[in-house]
């Protein structure tokens, strides 16, 4: 098929928009693959749609290989099902809510567990109807607080979500593993690096959850790799508790004047220059800081949360939470939010301190009224710390946990650092972007929505469910980010919007294009009346892997072939070039399928491991 640029919906730009946060995102905008229409909202242009459809078709093929059946649900749903499952409240402000003219509650679905469950409830009545795995590729909606990085964190995004339905837990595990294998094949064919990590189920619910993370410093997910190869999202990583220490002979805690000290570095410098610690250097890790947050009470289903820490907070009506963490650490807000779900927390601002005179900046410590204290696991019984004394310019030295101060619970929410000790040895901390997520939901939605079938003995039995998501638009953005240089995009052949990009420089040789008509390739011909420099610049920006230059420098059937992957140029007869491209396309498809079948390297299984490809 021949597509001429002169008749195509197409425009390129020479400069990145001011809001561009990454090189690949900038090229997608400049080359006209997508257009931003609002904060976190994008239009897909013809070039972008062609690449997106190729990604979707690879996903469809691999879903078909594990007998998953495609359907398509609406994005707009009545809130009734979501209220039944509890997610209407559990999702908080992350969902778009709206009302119809009769004041009925509706939402733009972030995922479709409830809809799939209701559909299967109406279709499946017997054990003979199971197992089934059903999926869709559809746009989803989440009210992101801070959309960023283009398609990587947007309010509207394309996603493949699949759901499995099984009669028992064994069947669920089999369906889960089938989807996991399919995901490996998909990402291998797309040549996307990934790590499989143990993850938090969050508002989705269920017992077992794993993420496919693409390692990149652009990522907003932190994951931990242990010495034995196990990998965990930081949200679920468990810090080993510090050992209990005998403090029977420990000296009494002392108050120390610390005028002007408002930070941990100030406190460390003051202590080391005070002369109190002869022969010892005080470090940040010797100090225990209290980070104060304001608690925002979200609606809690039935008023009886399963989270025991949250239950304590609700029962006693605390307004504030104080995290006691070593001075060389900070609170990881994502870990804290997971640990305290469905409550939300916000750092204490100036107004909090103005309304609470007992909250002394720089000297906050344990013991304040109205504060629920959560201590880091390293704050073990008998451990000694330098703490704030809750008085201006005063700290306490040698305060013993369990003797001089107490706390309401131990909560593992502090930041994790490379080199931290674990039961598997030192850990390595990395960043990544989630590209896939697997959940064993169990009976959560089946019980909530009444999905049951008759078993062999004629008894009603709740159906076990799994949920499996892939971010399609996010994959598109990551592939662009990975495949570019300083001049533009460099799409792999299997995903490129066209097989060939012809730069026509000589109208006298335009008849050569006719021989491309029936070759079976998808060809973009730049026939515009613009300078050669503009055409070459746009060809590099768009990133089709093979650029064919038809100009006066070659004669007869010869054309200049420009390989965008390595920027090498050769002169070949047109027919030979066409055959080479066709063979490359065929070989790329075959190789992708074969590579997709290789599941080697997974050390995870049910026990959880790290697969890095």
Curated annotation (Swiss-Prot):
Keywords: Aminoacyl-tRNA synthetase, ATP-binding, Cytoplasm, Ligase, Nucleotide-binding, Protein biosynthesis. One of its GO terms (cellular component) is cytosol. Gene3D superfamilies: Anticodon-binding domain (3.40.50.800), Bira Bifunctional Protein, Domain 2 (3.30.930.10). It is an enzyme of class 6 (ligase). The keyword Transport does not apply. It is found in: Cytoplasm. Its main location: cytoplasm. It catalyses: tRNA(Pro) + L-proline + ATP = L-prolyl-tRNA(Pro) + AMP + diphosphate. One of its GO terms (biological process) is prolyl-tRNA aminoacylation. GO terms for molecular function: ATP binding; proline-tRNA ligase activity. Its EC number is 6.1.1.15. SUPFAM superfamilies: Class II aaRS ABD-related, Class II aaRS and biotin synthetases. It holds the Pfam family tRNA-synt_2b. It comes from the Bacteria. Belongs to the class-II aminoacyl-tRNA synthetase family. ProS type 1 subfamily. Homodimer. PANTHER family: MITOCHONDRIAL RIBOSOME PROTEIN L39/PROLYL-TRNA LIGASE FAMILY MEMBER, PROLINE--TRNA LIGASE. Consists of three domains: the N-terminal catalytic domain, the editing domain and the C-terminal anticodon-binding domain. Catalyzes the attachment of proline to tRNA(Pro) in a two-step reaction: proline is first activated by ATP to form Pro-AMP and then transferred to the acceptor end of tRNA(Pro). As ProRS can inadvertently accommodate and process non-cognate amino acids such as alanine and cysteine, to avoid such errors it has two additional distinct editing activities against alanine. One activity is designated as 'pretransfer' editing and involves the tRNA(Pro)-independent hydrolysis of activated Ala-AMP. This is Proline--tRNA ligase. It comes from Tropheryma whipplei (strain Twist).
């Amino acid at each position: 098929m021949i597509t001429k640029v002169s008749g195509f919906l197409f425009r390129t730009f020479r400069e990145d928009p001011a809001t561009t946060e990454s090189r690949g995102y900038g090229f997608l905008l400049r080359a006209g693959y997508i257009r931003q229409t609002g904060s976190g909202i994008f239009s897909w242009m013809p070039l972008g749609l062609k690449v997106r459809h190729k990604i979707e078709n690879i996903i469809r093929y691999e879903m078909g290989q594990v007998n998953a059946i495609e359907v398509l649900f609406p994005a707009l749903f009545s809130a009734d099902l979501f209220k039944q499952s509890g997610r209407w409240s559990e999702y908080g402000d992350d969902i778009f809510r709206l009302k119809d003219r009769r004041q009925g509650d509706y939402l733009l679905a972030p995922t479709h567990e409830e809809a799939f469950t209701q559909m299967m409830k109406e279709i499946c009545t017997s054990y003979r109807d199971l197992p089934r795995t059903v999926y869709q590729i559809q746009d989803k909606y989440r009210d992101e607080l801070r959309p960023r990085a283009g398609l990587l964190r947007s309010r509207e995004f394309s996603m493949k979500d699949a759901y499995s339905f099984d009669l028992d837990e064994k069947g669920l595990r089999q369906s889960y593993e089938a989807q996991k294998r399919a995901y490996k094949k998909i990402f291998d064919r797309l040549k996307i690096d990934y790590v499989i990590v143990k993850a938090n189920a969050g508002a989705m619910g269920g017992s077992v959850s794993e993420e496919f993370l693409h390692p990149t410093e652009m990522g907003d997910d932190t994951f931990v790799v242990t010495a034995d190869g196990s990998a965990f999202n930081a949200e679920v990583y468990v810090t080993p508790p510090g050992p209990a220490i005998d403090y029977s002979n420990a000296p009494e805690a002392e108050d120390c004047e610390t005028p002007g000290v408002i930070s941990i570095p100030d406190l460390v410098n003051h202590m080391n220059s005070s002369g109190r610690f002869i022969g010892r250097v005080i470090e940040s890790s010797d100090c225990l800081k209290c980070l104060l947050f304001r608690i925002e009470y979200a609606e809690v289903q039935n008023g009886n949360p399963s989270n025991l820490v949250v239950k304590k907070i609700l029962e006693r009506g605390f307004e504030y939470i104080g995290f006691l963490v070593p001075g060389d650490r900070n609170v990881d807000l994502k870990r804290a939010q997971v640990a305290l779900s469905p409550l939300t927390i916000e750092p204490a601002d100036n107004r909090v301190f103005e309304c609470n005179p007992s909250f002394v900046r720089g000297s906050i410590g344990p013991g304040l009224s109205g504060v629920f204290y959560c201590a880091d696991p390293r704050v073990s019984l008998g451990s000694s710390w330098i703490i704030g004394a809750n008085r201006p310019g005063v700290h306490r030295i040698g305060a013993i946990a369990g003797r001089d101060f107490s706390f309401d619970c131990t909560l593992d929410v502090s930041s994790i650092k490379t080199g931290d000790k674990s039961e598997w040895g030192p850990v390595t901390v990395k960043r990544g972007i989630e590209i896939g997520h697997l959940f064993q939901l169990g009976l959560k939605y089946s019980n909530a929505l009444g999905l049951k079938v008759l078993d062999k003995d004629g008894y009603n039995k709740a159906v076990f469910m799994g949920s499996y998501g892939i971010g399609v638009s996010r994959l598109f953005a990551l592939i662009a980010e990975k495949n570019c240089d300083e001049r533009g995009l460099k799409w792999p052949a299997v995903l490129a919007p066209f097989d060939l990009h012809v730069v026509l420089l000589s109208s006298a040789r335009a008849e050569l294009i006719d021989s491309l008509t029936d070759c079976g390739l998808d060809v973009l011909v730049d026939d515009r009346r613009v300078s050669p420099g503009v055409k070459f610049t746009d060809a590099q920006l768009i990133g089709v892997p093979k650029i064919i230059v038809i100009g006066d420098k070659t004669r007869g059937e010869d054309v200049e072939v420009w390989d965008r992957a390595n920027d090498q140029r050769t002169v070949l007869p047109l027919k030979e070039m066409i055959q080479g491209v066709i063979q490359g396309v065929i070989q790329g498809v075959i190789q992708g399928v074969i590579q997709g079948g290789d599941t080697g390297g997974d050390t995870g299984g049910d026990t959880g491991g790290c697969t890095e490809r």
